[in-house]
Amino acid sequence: MFKSIMYALAVAPAVTSSSDKLPNGVVSASQLGSEKEKRKLKNVTKIVIVGGGAGGLSVASQLEHKFKNKGDIVIVEPSEKHYYQPLWTLVGGGIFSRKDSEKDEKDFIPKGATWVKDSVTVFKPEENIVLTKDGKEIDYDYLVVSTGLELYWDRVKGLKENLGKNGVTSNYSYDSCEKTFEFIKSLKPGNVAIFTVPTTGVKCGGAPQKILWLCDDYLRKHGIRDKVRLDFNSAGASMFPVKKYSEVLDKMAKERGVNQNFAHNLVEIKGDSKEAVFETPQGNKTVKYDMIHVVPPMGPHSVIKNSPLADPATGFVNVDKGTLQHVKYDNVFSLGDTSNLPTSKTAAAITSQAPILVGNLINHKLGLPLNHKYDGYTSCPITTSYSKIILAEFKYGFEVDESLPFDQSKESYFPMFLKKYVFPTAYWEGMLKGRWFGKNTLFNPIKTPEIN
């Protein structure tokens, strides 16, 4: 695997920016008909990708490789910066600077794509049109939606105004992830540190406890672990949704003296008095803290939730869990955090989803069956110390699906090496360029023809 990774980085071509390209994917309403006719005559397919994060850029790059000059790829994304968010755990542990997680979005827009620096406000799938905040009307032949999750900071009273001060921090924010390590270093004998998990699904189900274990290890290395109370307050019912890993983490918590408080949902932060209020089955419970790491509630963006694309039950884009095609609109696809796929929302999941989505979109274009199926594969490297990781890999039904030749529920040095030195490079130089396929490394498991 490692040799394959190094080879990939050596041969990967440079990405050329298209940030100065005119937005030829944007037309007025009166031009829509003529533009469609021109594309039809030239056999050009227009694909609009809403969202320029991990999912959107992965799909855009893979589509560019397949469509060559027969694809008009438009990426609608307002942000000028792109973040490798899995690194924020290690930033919170003092291993990296937050600047190591940040690059310019323009450097990852495929050279054949058009970047519309805007955000979509309305989806009109019946008309094959999206409307943007700046008043643009963009038509498409195919639509890919990958807008990610919205973090609901305001759903915990007092959280927004206290974030980054009064001992309140979160590795889910670029603005506060460096504060996490500052607060860990400030812990003293007699202090209490709390780590929370909300009622909603989150980005990477194991991330809320990664910083707990780094804090535990840091305090041990500095000889005060037995004098600082660590509480894991989760709105859930277990340490992890996959039984095999949850049992190991539960045992670890008991051995390391971590207090586990399940069915504890954070509802309020009182920064001035350093108190946290939790909703429990027995009523609200107020706890004093010196440091609290908060994972905010998360969910679909309102533009998705209120659109015809949404699953009424979840608010996420309603797709077939195998093909990633929308259940109603056959020219609409979705992947990653914004989809209603019943699996953990991680970058690793996207590495498996993207080639399947691209393969099925091409099959649909060619009038072929959508025979590529996503099995729910996802992965979560759970940092258990500064040197070791439990590498959780599983698929639909929380079925274990490990890829390394050892029991991955055991703490290991090798996955930490991957997380620190391989995965970031694979993300920037492979995944976003459409040349990294997760557990399949360089080898795209989906074989589809190029469109000429």
Swiss-Prot record:
Biological process annotations from GO: regulation of sulfur metabolic process; sulfide oxidation, using sulfide:quinone oxidoreductase
Binding site for FAD: 54-55, 77, 85, 120, 337, 345-348
Record's keyword annotation contains Oxidoreductase: yes
Alphabetized UniProt keyword annotations: Disulfide bond, FAD, Flavoprotein, Mitochondrion, Oxidoreductase, Quinone, Transit peptide
Xref: PANTHER family: SULFIDE:QUINONE OXIDOREDUCTASE (PTHR10632), SULFIDE:QUINONE OXIDOREDUCTASE, MITOCHONDRIAL (PTHR10632:SF2)
Role of this protein: Catalyzes the oxidation of hydrogen sulfide, with the help of a quinone.
Family: Belongs to the SQRD family.
Name of the protein this chain belongs to: Sulfide:quinone oxidoreductase, mitochondrial
Source organism per UniProt: Dictyostelium discoideum (Social amoeba)
